């Protein structure tokens, strides 16, 4: 009886992919081969692929069996529940034990013999898949048991909610009108700020209020920034400047020391007490237009007390004498020229 499902090969025969050839067809292939029929003729006659016929005949000649699969069957299972239990016990006693040490201990304790002892790779796979998760879960449970209960911390900003438990002081915040009440288990530590002031943004007022409510000791509260004005400070005396005594300011200005390398404010000398600059050297009336190098003095930005805008250093240039000499020389040259003509 042919199967009702399968595929058709090149010869027109039906086969099921992944399934072994039925035993009846296997036996018929062997019988035809013993009659002296060639494998190619057996393949055409039974509509079985040539490779399948050759493989079945080769296995029959080697082992004498027509059954599919391994001859001796699969290896018996060695990782029995008893072996896994002993491996778990060894691992719990010594978490740093190696797989080869577990194998030797199984043999030493008589749990397994040399024929059914699991291999090192099998023990490693058991430790990784079956015992590894249980060991991690046990460590996590023990860690949770020994872990102390976290103390509720102060929220940095009452705008955001934190996973820490809500303290009793934070739960005392009244609910704004028109907003439905929120249960204490899901309520936020603080309500939304009423303004965009520095105090509300940073949460200074809420933190200090919470500390003062939960602490038995008295702690000063931080006042609102808007309440800090100039009216809260004491009025300054009429003889004071910006709240400081004039006498103290005068003493500091009089005896104050200037930084190194800079003169003090009171050490400057007035311009009237300074001596005038020395008079420059006289220029001969018969010299051409020139001036001594010492006469070129770099002027300052301020004017001398006895000087003018043209002579800020109170040193007059003898320009009249020089110009008179030049004029006499010009007149003499003109007279000589006229007499020569």
Swiss-Prot record:
<dbReference type="InterPro" id="IPR036388">
    <property type="entry name" value="WH-like_DNA-bd_sf"/>
</dbReference>
<dbReference type="GO" id="GO:0000981">
    <property type="term" value="F:DNA-binding transcription factor activity, RNA polymerase II-specific"/>
</dbReference>
<comment type="subunit">
    <text>Interacts with KDM5B.</text>
</comment>
<dbReference type="GO" id="GO:1990837">
    <property type="term" value="F:sequence-specific double-stranded DNA binding"/>
</dbReference>
<dbReference type="GO" id="GO:0000978">
    <property type="term" value="F:RNA polymerase II cis-regulatory region sequence-specific DNA binding"/>
</dbReference>
<keyword id="KW-0217">Developmental protein</keyword>
<keyword id="KW-0238">DNA-binding</keyword>
<dbReference type="InterPro" id="IPR009057">
    <property type="entry name" value="Homeodomain-like_sf"/>
</dbReference>
<protein>
    <recommendedName>
        <fullName>Paired box protein Pax-9</fullName>
    </recommendedName>
</protein>
<feature type="region of interest" description="PAI subdomain">
    <location>
        <begin position="7"/>
        <end position="63"/>
    </location>
</feature>
<keyword id="KW-0539">Nucleus</keyword>
<keyword id="KW-0805">Transcription regulation</keyword>
<comment type="function">
    <text>Transcription factor required for normal development of thymus, parathyroid glands, ultimobranchial bodies, teeth, skeletal elements of skull and larynx as well as distal limbs.</text>
</comment>
<feature type="region of interest" description="Interaction with KDM5B">
    <location>
        <begin position="168"/>
        <end position="189"/>
    </location>
</feature>
<dbReference type="GO" id="GO:0071363">
    <property type="term" value="P:cellular response to growth factor stimulus"/>
</dbReference>
<dbReference type="GO" id="GO:0000785">
    <property type="term" value="C:chromatin"/>
</dbReference>
<feature type="DNA-binding region" description="Paired">
    <location>
        <begin position="4"/>
        <end position="130"/>
    </location>
</feature>
<keyword id="KW-0225">Disease variant</keyword>
<dbReference type="Pfam" id="PF00292">
    <property type="entry name" value="PAX"/>
</dbReference>
<dbReference type="GO" id="GO:0042481">
    <property type="term" value="P:regulation of odontogenesis"/>
</dbReference>
<dbReference type="GO" id="GO:0001228">
    <property type="term" value="F:DNA-binding transcription activator activity, RNA polymerase II-specific"/>
</dbReference>
<keyword id="KW-0804">Transcription</keyword>
<dbReference type="InterPro" id="IPR043182">
    <property type="entry name" value="PAIRED_DNA-bd_dom"/>
</dbReference>
<dbReference type="GO" id="GO:0042476">
    <property type="term" value="P:odontogenesis"/>
</dbReference>
<dbReference type="GO" id="GO:0060325">
    <property type="term" value="P:face morphogenesis"/>
</dbReference>
<dbReference type="GO" id="GO:0045892">
    <property type="term" value="P:negative regulation of DNA-templated transcription"/>
</dbReference>
<dbReference type="InterPro" id="IPR043565">
    <property type="entry name" value="PAX_fam"/>
</dbReference>
<feature type="region of interest" description="RED subdomain">
    <location>
        <begin position="82"/>
        <end position="130"/>
    </location>
</feature>
<dbReference type="GO" id="GO:0006357">
    <property type="term" value="P:regulation of transcription by RNA polymerase II"/>
</dbReference>
<dbReference type="GO" id="GO:0005654">
    <property type="term" value="C:nucleoplasm"/>
</dbReference>
<keyword id="KW-0563">Paired box</keyword>
<dbReference type="GO" id="GO:0005730">
    <property type="term" value="C:nucleolus"/>
</dbReference>
<dbReference type="InterPro" id="IPR001523">
    <property type="entry name" value="Paired_dom"/>
</dbReference>
<dbReference type="GO" id="GO:0007492">
    <property type="term" value="P:endoderm development"/>
</dbReference>
